[in-house]
C-alpha cells in the first residue's frame, strides 16, 4: 500500500476508534477469536452434522418442524449442556407450556433456569434483548415464534385483520438482536412450527410463522421431525426416532443429517447416541444383533451394549475419541441420501 493511502487509512481507523470505541474496526487477522464458540447439543451425531461441534454462540438458531417432533426436547437438552458447562440459561415460554418436571429429567437445573412467560410478542422479544445485553446469559430459548402474538392483535377484537403484524415485529426485533447477540456471545434459539400454505399445488406447501426475517437472520436452521416407527422394547413403545436436517448453516456445509433417539420421560440418551454414531463410523462393529469393539463384546442388542459402556467410562471415552478422529465418515453416512 502506498504511504499516503496507509496514513489516510490509519487516520480513519483512529477516528472510528475514538468515535465508536476500541475494536469497532479491525483487521481480520487481528481479531481475538476466529474460532466459533459453541454449546454442545447433547448428541454427538448432531454436533458432527453441524460441523462446528454444537449450536453457535453469538448467533441465532431456528429449530422448526411439525408438532411433537422433539423440538422443545432438543432445546432443553442444549440448555442442560450449557448449564453443565457453568453457563446461565433462559427460557422464554411464550406458549406457557414448559413442564419443569420433564425439563429436570432432561438434565436441566430448574432451580437456576431463568423463565419468563410474557403476555405479548413485543414483551417477549424485549426480554430476550435485555437478557442478551446483560452479557451474563449464555443461551436464550424462545418457545415458540407462533406464540409471539403482537400487542395490537391481543388487544383487538375477534375477527380483526392483523395482516403482517407478526412478520414486522420479528423483522424489527431481529435487526437489533443480531448485533446484541454477537457482542454478548449469547446463543439465541427460536423454536418454530410448520404450517401448510393453502392452495399450493407444486413445490413444498410447508411454511414457518413469523415471516422471512427469522430465516434470513438465522445462522443455523434445523428441521426436526419424526422418522420411521417408534422405538419399542417388546410391544411397548419407549421412544421416537427423530431426523434432524441442517437446512441452513453459515458456519459449515449445510444439508447434513443426524438421527436422534428420544426416549419418553428421559429424552436423549448420550450413550445410546454414541453407540449409533460409533457404528456409523466403523468404530463399533455390529454383526446381527451383537455389538463389539476390538476384543470387547459389548452385548446383544443396543441397550446391552450401552449398559456395558456406562459401566466402563474409560472405554466410553476411548470410543468417543476414535469417533471424533473419523468424523468425516459419520457425516458421509448421515448425508448419503443427499448424494444418491
From Swiss-Prot:
GO terms for cellular component: cytosol. PROSITE patterns: RECA_1, RECA_2, RECA_3. SUPFAM superfamilies: P-loop containing nucleoside triphosphate hydrolases, RecA protein, C-terminal domain. One of its GO terms (biological process) is DNA recombination. One of its GO terms (molecular function) is single-stranded DNA binding. Keywords: ATP-binding, Cytoplasm, DNA damage, DNA recombination, DNA repair, DNA-binding, Nucleotide-binding, SOS response. Its main location: cytoplasm. It comes from the Bacteria. InterPro entries: AAA+_ATPase, DNA_recomb/repair_RecA, DNA_recomb/repair_RecA_CS, P-loop_NTPase, RecA-like_C, RecA-like_N, RecA_ATP-bd, RecA_C_sf. It is found in: Cytoplasm. ATP binds at residues 65-72. Belongs to the RecA family. Can catalyze the hydrolysis of ATP in the presence of single-stranded DNA, the ATP-dependent uptake of single-stranded DNA by duplex DNA, and the ATP-dependent hybridization of homologous single-stranded DNAs. It interacts with LexA causing its activation and leading to its autocatalytic cleavage. This is Protein RecA. It comes from Thermus aquaticus. The gene is recA.
Amino acid at each position: 500500500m502506498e504511504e499516503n493511502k496507509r496514513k489516510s487509512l490509519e487516520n480513519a481507523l483512529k477516528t472510528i476508534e475514538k468515535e465508536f470505541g476500541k475494536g469497532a474496526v479491525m483487521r481480520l487477522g487481528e481479531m481475538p477469536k476466529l474460532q466459533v464458540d459453541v454449546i454442545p447439543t447433547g448428541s454427538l451425531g448432531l454436533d458432527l452434522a453441524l460441523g462446528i461441534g454444537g449450536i453457535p454462540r453469538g448467533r441465532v438458531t431456528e429449530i422448526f418442524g411439525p408438532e411433537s417432533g422433539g423440538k422443545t426436547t432438543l432445546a432443553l437438552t442444549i440448555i442442560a449442556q450449557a448449564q453443565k458447562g457453568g453457563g446461565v440459561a433462559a427460557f422464554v415460554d411464550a406458549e406457557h407450556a414448559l413442564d419443569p418436571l420433564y425439563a429436570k429429567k432432561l438434565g436441566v437445573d430448574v432451580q437456576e433456569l431463568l423463565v419468563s412467560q410474557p403476555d405479548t410478542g413485543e414483551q417477549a422479544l424485549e426480554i430476550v434483548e435485555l437478557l442478551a445485553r446483560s452479557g451474563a446469559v449464555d443461551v436464550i430459548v424462545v418457545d415458540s415464534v407462533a406464540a409471539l402474538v403482537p400487542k395490537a392483535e391481543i388487544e383487538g377484537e375477534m375477527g380483526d385483520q392483523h395482516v403482517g403484524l407478526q412478520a414486522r415485529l420479528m423483522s424489527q426485533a431481529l435487526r437489533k438482536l443480531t448485533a446484541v447477540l454477537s457482542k454478548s456471545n449469547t446463543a439465541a434459539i427460536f423454536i418454530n412450527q410448520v404450517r401448510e400454505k393453502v392452495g399450493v399445488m407444486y413445490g413444498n406447501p410447508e411454511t414457518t410463522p413469523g415471516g422471512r426475517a427469522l430465516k434470513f437472520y438465522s445462522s443455523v436452521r434445523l428441521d426436526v421431525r419424526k422418522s420411521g416407527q417408534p422405538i419399542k422394547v417388546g410391544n411397548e413403545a419407549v421412544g421416537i426416532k427423530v431426523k434432524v436436517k441442517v437446512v441452513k448453516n453459515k458456519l459449515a456445509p449445510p444439508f447434513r443429517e443426524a438421527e436422534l433417539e428420544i426416549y419418553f420421560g428421559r429424552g436423549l440418551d448420550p450413550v445410546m447416541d454414541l453407540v449409533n454414531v460409533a457404528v456409523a463410523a466403523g468404530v463399533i462393529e455390529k454383526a446381527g444383533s451383537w455389538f463389539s469393539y476390538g476384543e470387547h463384546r459389548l452385548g446383544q442388542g443396543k441397550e446391552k451394549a450401552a449398559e456395558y459402556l456406562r459401566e466402563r467410562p474409560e472405554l466410553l471415552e476411548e470410543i468417543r475419541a476414535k469417533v471424533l478422529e473419523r468424523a468425516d465418515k459419520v457425516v458421509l453416512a448421515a448425508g448419503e441420501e443427499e448424494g444418491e
